[in-house]
Amino acid sequence: MSVAIRVIPCLDVDAGRVVKGVNFADLRDAGDPVELARRYDGAGADELTFLDVTATSGNRETTFEMVARAAEEVFIPLTVGGGVREVADVDRLLRAGADKASINSAAVARPEVIDEITRHFGSQVLVLSLDARRVADGSTPSGFEVTTHGGRRGTGIDAVLWAREAADRGVGEILLNSIDADGTKAGFDLEMIRAVRAAVRVPLIASGGAGKPEDFPPAVQAGADAVLAASIFHFGPVDAIAQVKAAIRAAGFPVR
């Protein structure tokens, strides 16, 4: 693997503040999004992801003003998601200063929107945000189910098959988040990463479960091209990004 592994802090935004919870619940305040973005840029983050965690469930649009402020302050790629439903939403985000848009619930509801967005802007601007959870009852072939609305609603759709369909439709990369592992700090769901990696060729961002620097190399080993986390960066040591990169490098993978 010669392409550098990207380390991406995730800023879950609710009502203009960065929050972090466990399993998408019990949200705790982590600070001002633009301030944190500036801090992470300076600390060596490769990219930043903003997810408006209540935009879809509360039917609110993503805060374009926050994106514009962040884009003025930071000089690494910004991905923004939450409430992205159509071409016009992506257009507004890109004009505000985002480099990429992330889509989740709207694509599950109407997969053709992926084709429409990528036809307009190209695959490189669209990230599929895939919130998946384990199902033990054999209700999906892979044992992983797509969820929507911040992990609150099951869909009955197989997560691996959905990843493949989205890639076929043109998404540029997939942000794979384990709802079960999210916020637990117990490590990534490696089985889930391996299953999706085997099904798609587009870059794969692993998310959900990171608690310490040593949790990251196994995710890369399982097939992730990038690793995304929140708690370890928001509430961990100030040099957490450097520690994560050092751990990945020590495991034999290139980092920037």
Curated annotation (Swiss-Prot):
Keywords carried by this UniProt record: Amino-acid biosynthesis, Cytoplasm, Histidine biosynthesis, Lyase
Lineage of the species this protein comes from: Bacteria, Bacillati, Actinomycetota, Actinomycetes, Micrococcales
UniProt keyword Ion transport present: no
Enzyme Commission identifier(s): 4.3.2.10
General function of this protein: IGPS catalyzes the conversion of PRFAR and glutamine to IGP, AICAR and glutamate. The HisF subunit catalyzes the cyclization activity that produces IGP and AICAR from PRFAR using the ammonia provided by the HisH subunit.
Active-site residues, Swiss-Prot/TrEMBL: 12, 131
GO biological process, one term: L-histidine biosynthetic process
Organism the protein comes from: Renibacterium salmoninarum (strain ATCC 33209 / DSM 20767 / JCM 11484 / NBRC 15589 / NCIMB 2235)
Pathway: Amino-acid biosynthesis; L-histidine biosynthesis; L-histidine from 5-phospho-alpha-D-ribose 1-diphosphate: step 5/9
Family listed: Belongs to the HisA/HisF family.
CC annotations in GO: cytoplasm
Name of the protein in its database record: Imidazole glycerol phosphate synthase subunit HisF
Record-level Gene Ontology MF annotations: imidazoleglycerol-phosphate synthase activity; lyase activity
